[in-house]
């Protein structure tokens, strides 16, 4: 069996949504039975959707923060569902609000052990202090992401703004480490739910 390239799985997408209108959170909290609203503890109204499984923090200013999406399509569907829910319960919000992805977190596997001691010497913008943290912290400039690299070949990618950025960063990292000679490739298969590159 030939060695395979890296794989990854998106764990969370955080996005902001600008509805462009002020919202009466007290009124929405009364009408939406599933809403959580306790302004003494937190200024936003919390809504949790089950399909897709996403949480939304909704603020009086008309700004929303959505977390929990596993892909961009789920995020779009969740925003549509939230807009419909708000409209159905008296909020005058636009059908197509501005949505901006702030951060995508993905976990992955390079299917190779990584010599972190050598990698930190050869990669620019890399930091490795095993007494403090077992992973190498690599700040990639393009795409602009931070990748935690562990000796086992497991990785965590943060800071991506699109699914394409994640795929590009993981493949680019794999190629860089392979070219530097710090990967010890093993045989293996992608775990369920991971995208193979």
From Swiss-Prot:
Similarity section: Belongs to the TBP family.
Function as written in the Swiss-Prot or TrEMBL entry: General factor that plays a role in the activation of archaeal genes transcribed by RNA polymerase. Binds specifically to the TATA box promoter element which lies close to the position of transcription initiation.
Top-level lineage group: Archaea
GO molecular function annotation: DNA binding; DNA-binding transcription factor activity
InterPro entries referenced in this protein's UniProt entry, alphabetically: TBP (IPR000814), TBP_archaea (IPR033711), TBP_CS (IPR030491), TBP_dom_sf (IPR012295)
Keyword Repeat belongs to the record: yes
Sequence repeat residue intervals: 10-86, 101-177
Name of the protein: TATA-box-binding protein
Alphabetic keyword roster: DNA-binding, Repeat, Transcription, Transcription regulation
Coiled coil: none
SUPFAM superfamilies attached to this UniProt entry: TATA-box binding protein-like
Entry's Gene Ontology BP terms: DNA-templated transcription initiation
Keyword Repeat applies: yes
PANTHER family in the record: TATA-BOX BINDING PROTEIN
């Amino acid at each position: 069996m030939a060695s395979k390239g890296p794989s990854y799985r998106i764990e969370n997408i955080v996005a902001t949504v600008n509805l462009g209108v002020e919202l009466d959170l007290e009124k929405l909290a009364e009408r939406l039975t599933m809403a959580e609203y306790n302004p003494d503890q937190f200024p936003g109204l919390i809504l949790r959707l089950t399909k897709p499984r996403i949480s939304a923090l909704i603020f009086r200013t008309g700004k929303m923060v959505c977390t929990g999406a596993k892909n961009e399509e789920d995020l779009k569907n969740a925003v549509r569902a939230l807009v419909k829910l708000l409209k159905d319960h008296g909020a005058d919000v636009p059908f197509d609000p501005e949505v901006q992805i702030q951060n995508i977190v993905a976990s992955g596997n390079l299917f190779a052990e990584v010599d972190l001691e050598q990698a930190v010497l050869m990669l620019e913008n890399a930091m490795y202090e095993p007494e403090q943290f077992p992973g190498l912290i690599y700040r990639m400039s393009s795409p602009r992401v931070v990748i935690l690299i562990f000796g086992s070949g497991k990785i965590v990618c943060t800071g991506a703004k699109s699914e394409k950025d994640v795929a590009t960063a993981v493949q680019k990292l794999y190629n860089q480490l392979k070219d530097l000679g710090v990967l010890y490739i093993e045989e293996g298969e992608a775990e369920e739910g991971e995208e193979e590159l």
